């Protein structure tokens, strides 16, 4: 909220698609509603898993609580949840989750007829398709503009159930797409051996739309969604702040994104970035096959490495401080990780901060 969000979505202890997050109990939710509304921010709750018959009684009680506590709306996937909500809490606004896989204007119309005030479109649509949908309906349209992507269609995945024994459609995704795999033929031979390919064949890059945000605004999108659950508060604050300022600069008639904002977003977390389906680039360009987690930012190069002396000669492009984390990569595929807990040396003197342009030595406890 402090970073400029107009609305926040979060999950409760049940029926949300992030069951391994800490989430909010009912008392915490009441406090969150009060806090959000005090700051004139809307608060939406995810009720976006598939629901069993045995859970309908619990769900009905939960929906009544959400309505009574003053939630501004719920995000839903299951058709049964929609019907039940319309019956017992008809005034509670409903938003169609991206997992409802709405991909065209007729789907938006059907969702509206079912009582949806807003539709979160499938993440696989292009800018042109989003434009067509927005101009063909009066229903509010929401799209994801930043965050993790799923290798399966709008998150509808059975891999987690088959490989990890945990259902991604029930909020318990084990993220098997972030694991290493090999592509082999019938003889078991690695088809990608020796080629320019990493091990993480199913791991997508992160979505980043700062470069094309004006086009999304001009397409008529109502709401811009940033994926942030199970992310650190610092990540959410940095990303929301950057997009808030970007949107405001567009509305002010002069769209600019400072290089500092690009750098901050890249540094806080990235698997490398892509515009993916929005610019119709769904192939290898959107995959992060070399690593499935935060890759950090390039800060410089190793000019010389002396493993015996635990010393590296560095040429830095960015400033480094003590306690920064460094990951070293070799041309032959090896890598190692260090925290900057040993000082830098420049011209025979210890320095606590290595500025951009630094050319000197970095010592660590051991290389491995």
Predicted regions and their residues:
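Surface-exposed amphipathic alpha-helical tracts and adjacent flexible/coil segments at the periphery
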Residues: 1, 7-9, 14, 39-46, ...
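Active-site beta->alpha loop and helix N-cap motifs at the rims of alpha/beta catalytic domains
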Residues: 14-105
């Amino acid at each position: 909220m402090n970073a400029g969000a107009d609305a926040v979505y979060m999950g409760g202890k049940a029926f949300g698609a992030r069951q391994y997050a800490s989430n909010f109990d009912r008392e915490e939710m009441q406090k969150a509603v009060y806090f959000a509304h005090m700051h004139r921010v809307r608060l939406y709750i995810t009720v976006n898993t598939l629901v069993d018959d045995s859970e309908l009684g619990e769900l009905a009680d939960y929906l009544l609580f959400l309505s009574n506590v003053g939630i501004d709306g719920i995000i839903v996937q299951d058709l049964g949840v929609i019907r039940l909500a319309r019956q017992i809490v008809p005034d509670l606004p409903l938003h169609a989750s991206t997992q409802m896989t709405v991909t065209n204007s007729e789907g938006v119309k059907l969702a509206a007829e079912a009582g949806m005030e807003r539709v979160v479109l499938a993440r696989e649509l292009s800018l042109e398709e989003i434009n067509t949908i927005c101009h063909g309906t009066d229903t509010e349209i929401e799209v994801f503009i930043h965050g993790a992507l799923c290798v399966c269609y709008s998150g509808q995945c059975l891999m987690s159930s088959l490989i990890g024994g945990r259902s991604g459609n029930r909020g318990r995704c084990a993220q098997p797409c972030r694991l290493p795999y090999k592509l082999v033929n019938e003889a078991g031979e690695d088809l990608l051996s020796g080629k320019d390919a990493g091990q993480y064949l199913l791991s997508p890059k992160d979505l980043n739309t700062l470069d094309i945000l004006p086009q999304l605004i001009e397409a008529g999108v109502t709401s811009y969604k940033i994926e942030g659950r199970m992310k650190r508060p610092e990540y959410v604050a940095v990303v929301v702040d950057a997009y808030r300022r970007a949107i405001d600069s567009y509305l002010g008639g002069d769209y600019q994104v400072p290089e500092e904002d690009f750098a901050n977003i890249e540094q806080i977390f990235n698997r490398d970035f892509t515009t993916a389906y929005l610019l119709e680039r769904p192939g290898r360009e959107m995959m992060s096959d070399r690593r499935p987690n935060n890759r950090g930012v390039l800060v410089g190069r190793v000019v010389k490495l002396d493993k015996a002396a635990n010393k590296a000669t560095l040429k830095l492009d960015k400033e480094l401080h003590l306690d920064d984390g460094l990951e070293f990569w070799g041309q032959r595929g090896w890598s190692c990780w260090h925290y900057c807990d040993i000082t830098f040396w420049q011209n025979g003197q210890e320095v606590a901060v290595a500025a951009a342009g630094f050319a000197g030595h970095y010592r660590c406890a051991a290389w491995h």
